[in-house]
A protein has these predicted regions:
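Basic/polar, cationic surfaces and motifs that engage anionic cell-wall
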Residues: 2-13, 21-25, 29-91, 129-139, ...
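Active-site acidic/histidine clusters and adjacent loop/turn architecture
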Residues: 80-115
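Short Gly/Pro-enriched turn/cap motifs at secondary-structure boundaries
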Residues: 115-116, 146-148
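Short, small/polar residue-rich loop motifs at catalytic or cofactor-binding pockets
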Residues: 120
Length: 253
């Protein structure tokens, strides 16, 4: 496999995906903007269920490409930056059933582009209730916020849901820890920089139930443990098979 550019995970093939060792969830990330329609959701679910049970080892995880979850193209512009710290957000919208996760990302992106006029969805990586990881905005560009802090230098992770109202599933914490561990090793960022949105601006984000895992040190410990075990190899999963994986998520598989 060719060495990826710094800050951009390598692309994983279907064969490599099936060979990844692991535990729960699958994941997401950056690709093209055209969405490929899967032909057989049930087949996709069968094909990926075995992989799901093996994906999330201490060293390997998948990122579902933008085309897989149906992202629009990013607009031109944005602020280039160098990532120096890590910040946790929640969606502040009840997710409920995880089948809603990809559609929420599409809704968030439309809102951010059409209502706020931003170049793209505000965050760099998203994590759903089942620990699937989605790449959102390019990590080369600073995120956006409707609050009063400067996002330059921040690696922004979005946990889907409203954690003032919803509990935080274990799988979602695992996915968030993996995303942050990947960022820490890729951008050489200390885990001591990890913060919640509310630490930087006047907001309840990332919600009381999720913030509890920050304030207690639980999330940082999870990230540190992953790094001590060798870090996280976050690999991009793109094309028809990735689109089929998203269709399976939306079908409840």
């Amino acid at each position: 496999m060719c060495e990826p550019a710094r800050g951009r995970p390598a692309v994983v093939s279907r064969r490599q995906m099936l060979g990844l060792a692991g535990g729960v969830g699958a994941a997401a990330v950056v690709g093209t903007h055209s969405r490929t329609a899967p032909t057989d959701v049930a087949a996709a679910a069968r094909a990926t269920s075995t992989a799901d049970a093996r994906l999330m080892s201490a060293s390997s995880a998948l990122l579902l490409c933008r085309d897989a979850w149906g992202a629009r193209p990013a607009r031109s512009g944005g602020r280039r930056h160098t990532i120096t710290r890590m910040t946790l957000h929640h969606e502040a919208v009840v997710l409920g059933d995880n089948r809603n996760a990809p559609s929420h990302l599409r809704q968030d992106q439309r809102y951010h582009q059409d209502e706020h006029g931003w170049i793209d969805i505000a965050y760099h990586v998203g994590v759903d209730r089942n620990g699937n990881i989605y790449e959102l905005r390019s990590t080369e560009l600073a995120g956006d916020t409707a609050t009063d802090y400067d996002t330059t230098g921040h690696f922004l992770v979005l946990c889907e849901g409203d954690f003032d109202q919803e509990s935080v599933p274990e799988a979602q914490l695992v996915g968030a820890a993996r995303a942050f561990a990947w960022a820490a090793q890729t951008f050489r960022v200390a885990t001591t920089t990890l913060a919640g949105h509310r630490d930087l601006a006047s907001t309840s984000c990332p919600g009381a139930n999720l913030y509890a895992h920050l304030s207690s040190g639980d999330l940082k410990r999870r990230i540190d443990d992953l790094l001590a075990a060798g870090g996280v190899d976050l690999q991009r999963f793109c094309g028809p098979d990735a689109a089929a994986r998203v269709a399976a998520i939306e079908a409840g598989n």
